[in-house]
Curated annotation (Swiss-Prot):
Gene3D superfamilies cross-referenced by the UniProt entry: MFS general substrate transporter like domains
Gene from which the chain derives: NPF4.3
PROSITE patterns reported for this sequence: PTR2_1
Protein family according to the UniProt entry: Belongs to the major facilitator superfamily. Proton-dependent oligopeptide transporter (POT/PTR) (TC 2.A.17) family.
Induction of the gene: Down-regulated upon nematode infection.
Span list, region Disordered: 1-38
Name recorded for this polypeptide: Protein NRT1/ PTR FAMILY 4.3
Key word Transmembrane helix present: yes
Any GO CC annotation of this UniProt entry: membrane
Tissue specificity annotation: Expressed in flowers. Detected in roots and siliques.
Compartments where found: Membrane
Taxonomic lineage of the native organism: Eukaryota, Viridiplantae, Streptophyta, Embryophyta, Tracheophyta
Organism: Arabidopsis thaliana (Mouse-ear cress)
Alphabetic keyword roster: Membrane, Transmembrane, Transmembrane helix, Transport
Polar residues bias spans: 1-10
Membrane-spanning segments: 47-67, 85-105, 109-129, 157-177, 204-224, 233-253, 347-367, 395-415, 429-449, 463-483, 502-522, 551-571
């Protein structure tokens, strides 16, 4: 232990405010051979750069597939528009559902590094199979233009099976890789070390920058390849990008500090719930100091220091009541510590914050489906010889963000730190709220543009330039920079030891629920607005000039505003319940 202190002091040459926690964090991390990590050799931004490389290449590959998938599904597989939109949203939603599996396997059994390696190859195999399926004519329906010929043969049977098998291999691999990329990079920093804590916040911004770079290349270069060289070549390039990402990760093996997996991450949570139920008839003591706080079980998923008692969810406090007049040691299924109970309370308090981002991601789903189709109905000509692929519209915010994110981290964050005293500059909960508020205006812009585009096409016979669609993508890009990064940082800093990857997976589940909700919303809106046999609803036609996409966007704008108001309530509740005991938590901020 003394040797670790010596190395840590030599590394930073400054006083560590919480030395015991720093030492414990170092003991819990190991190198690739399972030996205790050395702060002079392992971790830090140098190690995180290899993970950022993987993140850029992985998002490059998956974004090139996902963002142009609706065009492929309609033009090559011949699915109708509404069904194609649901295929895309279900695919993206499933990716983020699989994130839960990846987070669980990492925290409980494999560790983040090996989880990424194993499922990285699963994702790679899916890209390769997609490329083969797109290349061989016998694995696709006969060529046909669905906009001209209404009798195009839809992919069915063996052809559909191959397509969906490849698609969901990609979903399984990407889903299990995503939360572990973020967690593994963040694991290279210690929250208990003041300087490292600031670097952790910068890492989350750097991770979003890597994400933006990957998205930008995917939505420009890779989509251009798909459009001009064919989807088979495009899917092959995605496979090559994933290969480069795996190579980037493996190259950093010698520098990583890895956290050991901790058996079942759900058992300590179950201990608290079962103990509280078994003692439900007991009265909770008015003095929290009477609650049991010294019963620690080896390998329990608890933070390195104890958590103070909070008055929220008082029913769970009954799990800490020690039965009097007995000398026998109670089972962990009947007696828990205050820290264990408080950790479960924290997880429960994250639920409304998590739920508040679902509608936000439903809006994202529209930008990857209907907004791409909007672009297809507009004038894509940039010059006599160059047309903008509609899927490349989504590159618009990322072009801006590759400049905005470094400026945010270099200038706005230091300035905000002086005002707020928070290591992140703008605290995570505030950051989430800013993004949720801005997303409403993305849908307002989209609705106004669609009304103008439809009227120009139907009434005047004019086709608007594709540049009119820019504002809705720009506004949402800025909102995503605030909400997505804020949510990841908030969840990571609230997570218990050994649950980092799983909590990161929950942030991705917000994407999943958002995309699934989009599918449900489209179906419900179509059903409600289908007034007759001839009317298929707002989104039931394959022709946007006959659909009422503008009204659907207005509906989403209203839902987004209501969602923001709901978030204000729950975020204030989260802050208030945390401040009652003067706990120094990431959510202690003004909104």
């Amino acid at each position: 232990m003394a040797e670790i202190n010596k190395q840590s002091n030599k590394w930073e040459q400054e006083e560590v405010s919480n030395e015991n926690n720093w030492e414990l964090a170092e003991e819990e991390s190991v190198d690739w051979r399972g030996r205790p990590s050395n702060p002079n050799k392992h971790g830090g931004m140098r190690a995180a750069l290899f993970v950022l490389g993987l993140q850029a290449f992985e998002i490059m590959g998956i974004a090139a597939v996902g963002n142009n998938l609706i065009t492929y599904v309609i033009n090559e597989m011949h699915f109708p528009l509404s069904k194609a939109a649901n295929i895309v949203t279900n695919f993206v939603g499933t990716i983020f559902i699989f994130a839960l599996l990846g987070g669980y396997l990492s925290d409980a059994f494999l560790g983040s590094f090996w989880t990424i390696i194993i499922f990285g190859f699963v994702e790679l195999s899916g890209f390769i199979l997609l490329s083969v399926q797109a290349h061989l004519p016998q694995l696709k329906p006969p060529k046909c233009n669905p906009l001209i010929d209404q009798t195009c043969e839809e992919a069915k049977g063996f052809k559909a099976m191959i397509f969906f098998m490849a698609l969901y291999l990609v979903a399984l691999g990407s889903g299990c890789v995503k939360p572990n990329m973020i967690a593994h990079g963040a694991d290279q920093f210690s929250q208990s070390h003041p300087k490292q804590s600031k670097r952790l916040s910068s890492y989350f911004n750097a991770a979003y920058f890597a994400f933006s770079m990957g998205e930008l290349i995917a939505l420009t270069l890779l989509v251009w390849v798909q459009t001009h060289s064919g989807m088979d070549i495009g899917f092959g390039v995605s496979a090559a990008a994933m290969t480069m990402g795996i190579i980037s990760l493996v190259s950093g093996t010698m520098y990583f500090r890895n956290k050991r997996p901790r058996r079942s991450i759900f058992t300590p949570i179950a201990h608290v719930i079962v103990a509280a139920i078994l003692k439900r008839k007991l009265a909770s003591p008015s003095d929290p100091r009477m609650l049991h706080g010294d019963h620690h079980v080896a390998n329990d998923v608890v933070p390195s220091s104890t958590l103070p008692h909070t008055p929220r969810f008082r029913f769970l406090d009954k799990a800490c009541i020690k039965i009097q007049d007995t000398n026998t040691k109670e089972s962990p299924w009947r007696l828990c510590t205050v820290t264990q109970v408080e950790q479960v309370k924290t997880l429960i308090s994250l639920v409304p914050i998590f739920a508040s981002t679902i509608v936000f991601n439903t809006i994202l789903a529209q930008l990857q489906t209907f907004s791409v189709q909007q672009g297809s109905s507009m004038n894509t000509r940039l010059s006599n010889s160059f047309h903008i692929p509609p899927a490349s519209l989504q590159a618009i915010p990322y072009i801006m963000l590759i400049f905005l994110v470094p400026l945010y981290d270099s200038f706005l964050v230091p300035f905000a730190r002086k005002l707020t005293g928070h290591n992140s500059g703008i605290p995570p909960l505030t950051r989430i709220g800013i993004g949720l508020f801005l997303s409403t205006f993305s849908m307002v812009s989209a609705a106004m543009l669609e009304k103008k585009r439809r009227d120009s096409s139907v009434l005047d016979g004019r086709i608007l330039s594709i540049f009119w669609i820019t504002p809705q993508f720009l506004i949402f890009g800025i909102s995503e920079m605030f909400t997505a990064v804020g949510l990841i940082e908030f969840f990571y800093k609230q997570s218990a030891k050994g649950m980092e990857s799983f909590l990161m997976a929950l942030t991705y589940c917000s994407y999943s629920f958002g995309f699934y909700f989009s599918s449900v919303l489209v179906s419900v809106v179509n059903k409600i607005t289908s007034t007759s046999v001839d009317s298929k609803g707002w989104l039931g036609e394959n022709d946007l000039n006959k659909d009422r996409l503008d009204l659907f966007y207005w509906l989403l704008a209203v839902l987004s505003l209501l969602n923001f108001l709901s978030y204000l309530f729950w975020s204030r509740w989260n802050i208030k319940s945390s401040r009652r005991n003067n706990t120094n938590v990431v959510g202690d901020e003004n909104i």
